[in-house]
């Protein structure tokens, strides 16, 4: 497997990506110290879609409320055995179709930048579950202690492409107990969820958070995320920030009990938006761009 190693030209920060394993970020180190949650590792991600590192959640992030959705009057069914479809413990489709997907093509690779492309139009198995021909280009740049991930969706043909994707960076503050980590968020709108993790339709305003993680757990959805919003986790003199720079108006915060990880997930639309609507499109001739960065 080809592993791409990116090095910050001005700092001892190194990132590694595996394009042929789903264009997943597998490592981010500062002076050799790992800052990404490895969980069960890359092998489990490839074998069973068990997320780790910085996986791509595409074409939808988080879960869908059922195995079908409608776009522009066209109803699409997700067959239980369809390529790439994985489900959560409640049987709901989870995190899109691209876990471990090998069809990414590396376009450019340098000491601190990687660009890879996925042609949805070239894969009938992907089109069966997401019938919107398009190109997805992901460019990763490492500079000034920041990993910047820029995604561009370009429609091919005359069908607009729903934008419901996201990323799932697993962050950790090494050598500091989880209970002592401090998390920070901007003002957000908290989406209330049901027992299956789906929005109920109710929401409440949430003021900015600055608090110790303690023994708390999160699996919470948000929208109205302002452009440029900063989420952070810190401890022991170390601070890791996730910047929602462009194109990510929704978020999920995930901090499971018993795991030394916290996730601030940039999302182009809230959970289950592909079924409920309210998302944006990449229209023909008008590529859509979304950018987030992780600063260490």
Regions found by a protein language model. Name each.
Residues 6-8, 16-19, 28, 120-163, ...:
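Acidic, contiguous internal or C-terminal segments within carbohydrate-active enzymes
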Residues 233-266, 271:
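Glycine-rich active-site loops that engage anionic ligands at enzyme catalytic sites
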Residues 1-11:
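Short, Gly/Pro- and small/polar-rich lid/capping loops
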């Amino acid at each position: 497997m080809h592993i791409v190693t990116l090095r910050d030209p001005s700092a001892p920060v190194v990132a590694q990506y595996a394009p042929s394993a789903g264009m997943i970020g597998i490592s981010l180190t500062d002076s050799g110290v790992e800052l990404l949650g490895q969980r069960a590792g890359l092998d489990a991600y490839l074998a069973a879609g068990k997320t780790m590192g910085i996986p791509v959640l595409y074409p939808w992030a988080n879960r869908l409320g059922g195995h079908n959705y409608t776009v522009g009057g066209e109803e699409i069914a997700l067959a239980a055995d369809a390529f790439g479809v994985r489900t959560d413990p409640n049987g709901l489709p989870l995190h899109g179709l691209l876990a471990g997907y090998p069809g990414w093509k590396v376009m450019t690779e340098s000491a601190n930048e990687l660009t890879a492309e996925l042609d949805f139009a070239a894969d009938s198995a992907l089109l069966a579950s997401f019938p919107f021909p398009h190109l997805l280009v992901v460019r990763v740049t490492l500079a000034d202690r920041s990993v910047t991930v820029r995604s561009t969706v370009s429609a091919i043909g005359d069908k607009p492409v729903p934008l419901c994707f996201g990323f799932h960076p697993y962050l950790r503050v090494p050598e500091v107990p989880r209970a002592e980590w401090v998390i920070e968020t901007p003002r957000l709108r908290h989406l209330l969820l049901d027992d299956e993790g789906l929005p109920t339709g109710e929401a409440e305003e949430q003021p900015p958070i600055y608090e110790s993680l303690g023994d708390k757990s999160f699996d919470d959805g948000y929208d109205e995320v302002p452009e440029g919003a900063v989420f952070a986790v810190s401890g022991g003199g170390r601070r890791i920030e996730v910047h929602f720079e462009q194109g990510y108006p929704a978020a999920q915060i995930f901090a499971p009990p018993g795991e030394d990880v916290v996730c601030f997930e940039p999302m182009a639309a809230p959970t289950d938006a592909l079924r409920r609507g309210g998302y944006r499109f990449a229209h023909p001739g008008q590529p859509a761009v979304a950018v987030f960065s992780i600063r260490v």
